[in-house]
Amino acid sequence: FFDADGRLWMVYGSYSGGIFILEMDADTGFPRPGQGYGKKLLGKNHSRIEGPYILYHPQTAYYYLFLSFGGLMAKDGYNVRVARSRTPDGPYLDALGQDMIDCGGRPGSFFRDEDIAGYGAKLMGSWRFDPLPGEENRDSVGYRSPGHNSAIYDEETGRSFIIFHTRFSGRGEYHQVRVHQMFMNEEGWPLV
Protein backbone atom coordinates (compact mmCIF):
# COMPACT_ATOMS: atom_id res chain seq x y z
CA PHE A 1 0.00 0.00 0.00
CA PHE A 2 1.02 3.62 -0.45
CA ASP A 3 0.94 5.90 2.56
CA ALA A 4 -0.26 9.51 2.62
CA ASP A 5 3.23 10.68 1.60
CA GLY A 6 3.47 8.31 -1.38
CA ARG A 7 5.83 5.78 0.26
CA LEU A 8 5.28 2.10 -0.57
CA TRP A 9 4.84 -0.48 2.22
CA MET A 10 4.18 -4.20 2.48
CA VAL A 11 2.41 -5.81 5.43
CA TYR A 12 2.69 -9.59 5.69
CA GLY A 13 2.79 -12.59 7.99
CA SER A 14 0.56 -15.01 9.83
CA TYR A 15 0.19 -17.60 12.56
CA SER A 16 3.54 -18.60 14.06
CA GLY A 17 5.70 -15.64 13.11
CA GLY A 18 3.35 -12.71 13.56
CA ILE A 19 2.50 -9.72 11.38
CA PHE A 20 5.29 -7.47 10.05
CA ILE A 21 5.60 -4.33 7.94
CA LEU A 22 8.39 -3.39 5.53
CA GLU A 23 9.00 -0.15 3.67
CA MET A 24 9.51 -0.95 -0.02
CA ASP A 25 11.42 0.73 -2.84
CA ALA A 26 8.71 1.88 -5.26
CA ASP A 27 11.13 1.74 -8.22
CA THR A 28 12.38 -1.82 -7.69
CA GLY A 29 9.54 -3.40 -5.72
CA PHE A 30 12.09 -4.76 -3.23
CA PRO A 31 12.31 -3.96 0.49
CA ARG A 32 14.48 -1.01 1.44
CA PRO A 33 17.83 -2.25 2.83
CA GLY A 34 18.54 -2.79 6.51
CA GLN A 35 15.06 -3.77 7.70
CA GLY A 36 15.51 -7.51 8.17
CA TYR A 37 12.04 -9.00 8.47
CA GLY A 38 10.64 -5.52 9.11
CA LYS A 39 8.88 -4.08 12.12
CA LYS A 40 6.68 -6.50 14.04
CA LEU A 41 3.14 -5.21 14.51
CA LEU A 42 1.59 -8.15 16.43
CA GLY A 43 1.33 -11.90 16.97
CA LYS A 44 3.31 -14.52 18.85
CA ASN A 45 3.22 -18.16 19.93
CA HIS A 46 1.17 -19.65 17.09
CA SER A 47 -1.71 -17.17 17.22
CA ARG A 48 -4.32 -17.74 14.52
CA ILE A 49 -4.00 -14.28 12.96
CA GLU A 50 -3.42 -13.79 9.24
CA GLY A 51 -4.34 -11.89 6.11
CA PRO A 52 -3.08 -8.43 7.12
CA TYR A 53 -4.13 -5.50 4.97
CA ILE A 54 -3.59 -1.77 5.58
CA LEU A 55 -5.76 0.99 4.14
CA TYR A 56 -5.12 4.71 4.56
CA HIS A 57 -8.37 6.67 4.84
CA PRO A 58 -7.90 10.38 4.02
CA GLN A 59 -11.19 11.43 5.66
CA THR A 60 -10.00 10.22 9.08
CA ALA A 61 -6.21 10.43 8.50
CA TYR A 62 -5.84 6.94 10.01
CA TYR A 63 -4.16 3.81 8.70
CA TYR A 64 -6.45 0.82 9.29
CA LEU A 65 -4.91 -2.60 9.84
CA PHE A 66 -7.38 -5.35 8.92
CA LEU A 67 -6.69 -8.89 10.15
CA SER A 68 -8.38 -12.28 10.12
CA PHE A 69 -8.58 -14.05 13.50
CA GLY A 70 -9.42 -17.69 14.22
CA GLY A 71 -9.50 -20.88 12.22
CA LEU A 72 -10.32 -20.88 8.53
CA MET A 73 -12.91 -23.65 8.40
CA ALA A 74 -16.64 -22.82 8.48
CA LYS A 75 -16.99 -24.04 12.06
CA ASP A 76 -13.84 -22.30 13.34
CA GLY A 77 -15.10 -18.74 13.76
CA TYR A 78 -12.82 -16.94 11.28
CA ASN A 79 -13.55 -13.20 11.60
CA VAL A 80 -12.23 -9.77 10.59
CA ARG A 81 -10.69 -7.42 13.17
CA VAL A 82 -9.37 -3.90 12.73
CA ALA A 83 -6.94 -1.59 14.53
CA ARG A 84 -5.66 1.84 13.53
CA SER A 85 -2.65 4.13 13.66
CA ARG A 86 -1.65 7.64 12.64
CA THR A 87 1.50 6.25 11.00
CA PRO A 88 1.87 3.37 8.53
CA ASP A 89 4.23 1.36 10.76
CA GLY A 90 2.21 1.73 13.95
CA PRO A 91 1.71 1.36 16.76
CA TYR A 92 -1.77 0.03 15.91
CA LEU A 93 -4.39 0.35 18.64
CA ASP A 94 -7.81 -1.25 18.82
CA ALA A 95 -11.03 0.54 19.85
CA LEU A 96 -10.22 -0.10 23.54
CA GLY A 97 -6.82 1.56 23.13
CA GLN A 98 -4.89 -1.72 23.40
CA ASP A 99 -1.61 -1.86 21.50
CA MET A 100 -1.79 -4.76 19.04
CA ILE A 101 1.88 -5.60 19.68
CA ASP A 102 0.59 -7.26 22.88
CA CYS A 103 -1.82 -9.49 20.93
CA GLY A 104 -0.59 -13.08 20.86
CA GLY A 105 -0.63 -16.44 22.54
CA ARG A 106 0.88 -17.18 25.93
CA PRO A 107 4.40 -18.64 25.98
CA GLY A 108 4.27 -22.29 24.95
CA SER A 109 0.71 -22.02 23.65
CA PHE A 110 -0.53 -23.32 20.33
CA PHE A 111 -3.61 -21.84 18.59
CA ARG A 112 -5.27 -20.58 21.81
CA ASP A 113 -7.88 -18.25 20.31
CA GLU A 114 -8.96 -17.16 23.80
CA ASP A 115 -5.56 -15.46 24.24
CA ILE A 116 -6.21 -13.12 21.31
CA ALA A 117 -10.02 -12.80 21.56
CA GLY A 118 -9.90 -9.47 23.40
CA TYR A 119 -7.84 -7.65 20.76
CA GLY A 120 -8.91 -5.77 17.66
CA ALA A 121 -12.30 -4.24 16.95
CA LYS A 122 -14.42 -7.01 15.43
CA LEU A 123 -15.63 -5.80 12.05
CA MET A 124 -17.43 -8.94 10.90
CA GLY A 125 -17.94 -12.56 11.87
CA SER A 126 -20.32 -15.45 11.36
CA TRP A 127 -24.05 -14.78 11.53
CA ARG A 128 -27.18 -16.72 10.65
CA PHE A 129 -30.91 -16.13 10.28
CA ASP A 130 -32.85 -19.38 10.59
CA PRO A 131 -36.01 -19.99 8.56
CA LEU A 132 -39.20 -18.60 10.06
CA PRO A 133 -42.24 -20.81 10.69
CA GLY A 134 -43.63 -21.74 7.28
CA GLU A 135 -40.20 -21.47 5.62
CA GLU A 136 -38.94 -24.92 6.61
CA ASN A 137 -37.79 -25.69 3.06
CA ARG A 138 -35.44 -22.69 3.05
CA ASP A 139 -31.83 -22.93 4.23
CA SER A 140 -30.50 -20.62 6.90
CA VAL A 141 -29.25 -17.32 5.55
CA GLY A 142 -25.93 -15.87 6.66
CA TYR A 143 -22.16 -15.86 6.50
CA ARG A 144 -19.83 -18.45 8.04
CA SER A 145 -16.23 -17.52 8.79
CA PRO A 146 -15.83 -14.34 6.69
CA GLY A 147 -12.29 -13.05 6.36
CA HIS A 148 -8.98 -12.64 4.54
CA ASN A 149 -10.00 -9.26 3.25
CA SER A 150 -8.63 -6.32 1.39
CA ALA A 151 -10.14 -2.84 1.25
CA ILE A 152 -10.28 0.16 -1.04
CA TYR A 153 -10.99 3.86 -0.69
CA ASP A 154 -12.52 5.41 -3.83
CA GLU A 155 -11.14 8.95 -4.07
CA GLU A 156 -13.80 10.04 -6.59
CA THR A 157 -16.79 9.07 -4.45
CA GLY A 158 -15.24 9.13 -0.97
CA ARG A 159 -16.63 5.65 -0.34
CA SER A 160 -14.79 2.67 1.15
CA PHE A 161 -15.30 -1.00 0.39
CA ILE A 162 -14.17 -4.26 1.96
CA ILE A 163 -13.53 -7.32 -0.22
CA PHE A 164 -13.50 -10.70 1.55
CA HIS A 165 -14.36 -14.37 1.19
CA THR A 166 -17.04 -16.16 3.19
CA ARG A 167 -18.71 -19.52 3.56
CA PHE A 168 -22.44 -20.13 3.99
CA SER A 169 -24.66 -22.18 6.27
CA GLY A 170 -25.27 -25.67 4.92
CA ARG A 171 -22.63 -25.44 2.16
CA GLY A 172 -19.58 -26.90 3.87
CA GLU A 173 -16.23 -25.34 3.02
CA TYR A 174 -17.33 -23.83 -0.30
CA HIS A 175 -16.79 -20.07 -0.26
CA GLN A 176 -17.34 -16.99 -2.42
CA VAL A 177 -15.99 -13.46 -2.63
CA ARG A 178 -18.16 -10.61 -1.38
CA VAL A 179 -17.84 -6.81 -1.51
CA HIS A 180 -19.55 -4.54 1.04
CA GLN A 181 -19.43 -0.81 1.56
CA MET A 182 -17.80 0.40 4.77
CA PHE A 183 -18.93 3.46 6.68
CA MET A 184 -16.99 5.41 9.30
CA ASN A 185 -18.65 6.12 12.65
CA GLU A 186 -18.20 9.37 14.59
CA GLU A 187 -15.09 7.99 16.32
CA GLY A 188 -13.48 7.12 12.98
CA TRP A 189 -13.96 3.33 13.12
CA PRO A 190 -15.15 1.39 10.08
CA LEU A 191 -18.53 -0.37 10.09
CA VAL A 192 -19.81 -2.85 7.52
Task: Label each residue range with its predicted role.
Residues 1-192:
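Carbohydrate-active catalytic/glycan-binding domains of CAZyme proteins
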